[in-house]
Swiss-Prot record:
The chain crosses the membrane at residues 57-77, 101-121, 143-163, 184-204, 271-291. It comes from Methanocaldococcus jannaschii (strain ATCC 43067 / DSM 2661 / JAL-1 / JCM 10045 / NBRC 100440). Its main location: membrane. This is Uncharacterized protein MJ1571. It is a multi-pass membrane protein. One of its GO terms (cellular component) is ATP-binding cassette (ABC) transporter complex.
């Protein structure tokens, strides 16, 4: 195993000329490392780790819904601060947590919101004039809307991420089963979660194999052809893996229902945390609407 790893490492060092390939490899490896990294925080002692799983999911969803209902930047900042405080009290390194929350999805949301800032999408007071004839500018109303939208997405992600970081996956599936989520949804989600790692390793193996057999840099058309072949091979492998997994489950007595073992009990501290989330969310939403 170590010999194969050393060969792969040597191939990467000698042939890392294609920047797109480099970035793809790096992204996949980081994805795997981040998931392994966050898994260990489900087993440490912290605020959210000690909350019963059903209560935790319901409470974080309540915070998330409150963030969606909020329309003002100040309210969203307060919700975001609550998420950071919960992460800190759960002994999660804030730097890693912020990277997880803000690196991709909020940036993507901000890019989507860019057109809304212009006067032809959101008329209003000009903040920055780009062209006079035709008149194209960034308006104050559009800028506020874009910031609010991006911050709302970031806040929702910050609460959603806390669930898998602080809860073991088997407890998540058992908890949502207790909450009445259909068994089919749980089964599909469970299989997807468990086999995504195998598929990512298969993608890595394909990339290593392709790189070890390429001498010269491929042109754009050749790269597209190779990418198409890789996607086709991945699809076939995924289909075969799904069939094998299904027949293996049938051979072991699977009848469409998975047995869930749930041993957690609701305690006073769990009820207190649920009441805290309800009261804080209600107060912030009322404050956002100008009622308080």
């Amino acid at each position: 195993m170590f010999k194969i790893y050393n060969i792969k490492s040597r191939i990467i060092r000698e042939n890392m000329n294609n920047k797109l390939f480099d970035k793809t490899i790096e992204h996949v490896i980081k994805y795997l490392n981040e998931n392994i990294f966050f898994e260990k925080y489900t087993r440490i002692s912290g605020l959210l780790q000690n909350i019963e799983s059903r209560i935790k999911i319901i409470s974080l969803v309540i915070f998330l819904v409150g963030s969606v209902l909020s329309k003002h930047i100040l309210t969203l900042i307060i919700f975001n601060s609550i998420a950071l405080i919960l992460a800190y009290l759960s002994n999660i390194p804030l730097l890693q947590y912020l990277k997880r929350v803000y690196v991709f999805i909020p940036i993507f949301a901000g890019i989507i919101a860019i057109p809304v800032m212009f006067n032809f999408m959101t008329p209003g007071k000009d903040v920055f004039v780009i062209l006079n004839n035709p008149h194209i500018s960034i308006t104050y109303e559009g800028l506020i809307y874009a910031i609010t939208f991006t911050l709302r997405v970031a806040t929702c992600v910050s609460f959603a991420v806390l669930i898998p970081i602080t809860t073991q996956w088997n407890k998540v599936t058992s908890a949502i089963h207790k909450l009445g989520v259909p068994e089919v949804v749980i089964t599909i989600t469970n299989l997807a979660y468990r086999y995504i790692f195998l598929l990512l390793n298969f993608v890595l193996d394909m990339m290593y194999s392709r790189k070890s057999r390429v001498v010269n840099k491929l042109g754009m058309v050749e790269s597209w052809k190779e990418a198409g072949k890789a996607i086709g091979a991945l699809f076939i492998k995924t289909y075969q893996m799904g069939e094998d997994x299904y027949y293996a489950m049938l051979s072991r007595g699977y009848n469409g229902e998975i047995k869930h073992i749930y041993r957690e009990e609701i305690k006073i501290k769990d009820i207190a945390f649920l009441l805290f989330s309800i009261i804080i969310t209600a107060l912030l939403v009322l404050f956002d609407r100008g009622i308080l």
